[in-house]
Each structure stands twice: as C-alpha cells, then as structure tokens.
Amino acid sequence: MEKADGAAPGWYLTDLNARAATGADFLAILDERGTPVWYQRLDRALIDAKLLSTGNISAAENESRFSTKPEVGHRMIALDGTLVDEWLTDSNDHPPDKHDIAEIPELPDGRAIISYPLLDGVDLSSLAPDQSLPAPIRCDGSVAGVDKTIVDGSIREISGDGTLVWDWNMSDYFGMEEVRIPLCFKKYPAENSGAGEVDVFHINSLQRVVEDDCGTECDYVVSARHLDAVFRVDRPTDAVEWILSSSPESLENLSGAERLNIVGDPHFGPLRPHDAILKGDILTMHDNRSLTNPEEAARFVQYRIDTSSSDSADWTATMVRQIESPFGFSSGALGSARLADDGSVLVGWGSLQPVFVEYGSTGTELLRIAVPGVTPYRIVKYAPDDFDADELRATAGNTTQAPPPPP
C-alpha cells in the first residue's frame, strides 16, 4: 500500500497471479486502507473474480490469450475455499472464455458466457496485418485472403442444466473491413496453413444491462478489443443498437448499426478497450491504448451517451472526463476501470504497471496499492454490507478446492 487517504469504506476483490512460474496465485479482498482481510491460495491462476448474488465468488482459469478448453468452466467458490459448482459451456465447439461472465439471476444458475469458436471459410482479403507487431502475436501476411479460419466471438446464455437459451455471434453483425488490429495467437497452429487462427474480434468484457424490468431479456454492452469498439446489443431483437469506436464514422457496419458521434475526446475514441460498463447514460471503460506507435498512455475514459434524437445519425458519445495512466504507458493488456455512485473511480492499470489507484470525483488519488510481481486482471469494489469482516477473517488462508480432472 503506497497511499490511503480518504477512500470510502468498501471491499476490493481482485486476483493476484504471479508472474514467475514458481510464484503463488491468490484471490484476495482488501479494505479501504489497502489491508488484506481475506485471501485464498489457488491451485492455478484464476481471473475475473466477482461476487455473485449467491454470496459465492466466480473466477476463471487464466489460459493464455483466450480459452480453448470446453471442459474447463467458471468456478463458483465459497469464502472458505469450497468449490460450490463449475459453470460449463453448452457445446464443445464453444469453450467458455475467461474474460468475463454475466450472471442471470432470473434463471437458476443462469449465465451469459463469451466463447471464441473457430469459423472456417471467411474472406479476409481486406485485412492488412501489421508486420511491425511482436512476432508471438503478429499475423503472417498470408492470412489476408479467402477461405481463411478465424475465431469468432459468441455470447451464449446458458441455464443451470446446461441448456442453451440464446446465442449471438459477432460475425453476423461485424464485417472483416471493420477489424482494426487482427492478431494471431496460434492457439490452433495448424489453421491457415500453419499461420494459425486469426483473432479478429476479441471480446474482452461483457455487461448485462439490467434496466426497465428487462427480466430474462436484458441488453448487453460488449467490448471488442480488435475492433477498437464498445457496442450495445438489443437482446429482444439481437440488433446492434449503437457502436462507440475510434473507426471513422464513414466506415459502415455490416448490420447497419450507427457509430456514435464522439464529442470532446482528444483521442477520438478508444484503442484496445477493456471493461466497458454502462450505468444509465454513462459509459466507462479502461482504454488500454496498447500496441500504439508511438506509445500512448492508457486511460480511464467516461462518456455520456445520447440516443434521444429520432435520427440515429445524430446520436452522440460526449467525453465527460479521462484519467491517464500515472506512468504514461499503455496497459499492454488487462486493466479495469469502475465508476462509483459518488464519482470516484477505481482503476487497475494493467499488466505493464501492476498498480491499483482509486481517484476521487475531482481526480485526486485516494488510494494506491502497488502489487509488484503479479499480473492482476481486474479489481472491483463492493459495498461494506456485501461482505462481513468477521466472516472474511474466519475463512481466510485456505487453498481453494479445485475441480476434479476432466474424464
């Protein structure tokens, strides 16, 4: 803890995954002074820790880049470390991805997952892979052609018994001309004649927007890193309602959705966004600005969305404020940003600078916690009543129960 000066009471839930192969991995809950009150040692690195309505904590195995194992789901962990359940996918062709999961309390054990299914026969002639990117993630120029293989982005609502309730796929609504930074992680190295699959969308955050008594059909706000875009999906119709993107407004969306007119943003929109959250008309995100040349500082950015005009061409996203990384670097990857009702903001500054900072409504630092040697994915602040301090202390210090090995 480097600074604690005025943060409102609350509980800070995060993962602390060791950079070194010999290090230990933990889930942890800190108080507003940055003091660890609860922790559980893990059998392996888990990310996307969040509190569910049941009082359990969900977290997912941190497979590199994106998840490819259909037999590995999101763990439901009690505070004492007991494995309560594991939420799996509905289909082996749709492995549950690690980046995010949205609870659907209206369905018993219901959830919306992200998946990166393989999709063959795609025309990638419009792609121009950036050959200046690092070799481990760079796409070979040969992937720019016809009949290629990508990983799609799928949102899948699944009931507690594993039944698919609803699904939605990126490739039905976004064209390859909209891809800004295709990467090839070679999770499937035999694809595309050895060049590996092309990750053209890369969904990395999923928020279920609970409003207007939406019941089981609530909209979703989605962040797609490789489109440099955040967008809203209308759940009842499947349509993309709007897109906030740094792409030119003249770039037509495959489904005809409007790109919001960005007002007052000196960067004209996000680059490699993450952790997009919509509350009312306020949209926030962690804008990684990664893989930029020259390097640009990561930032928290807040927009006000106005879709009141009868003409969707007049819809706007007006920047309310931004907070740039105190180090002046991009985030590389990871990163989170959460706006509280009192105007304070809690930011996890990503993989290149593992620091959590909470800012007051005027931008003053209230809390700074440095976590060297680990790569935390996200940090979320919960209200004082969401956890009991005595229970946290009483259940701390165990090793979480791991699921049995798959058959």
Briefly describe each language-model feature range.
Residues 1-407:
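Histidine-/acidic-rich catalytic cores in large beta-rich domains
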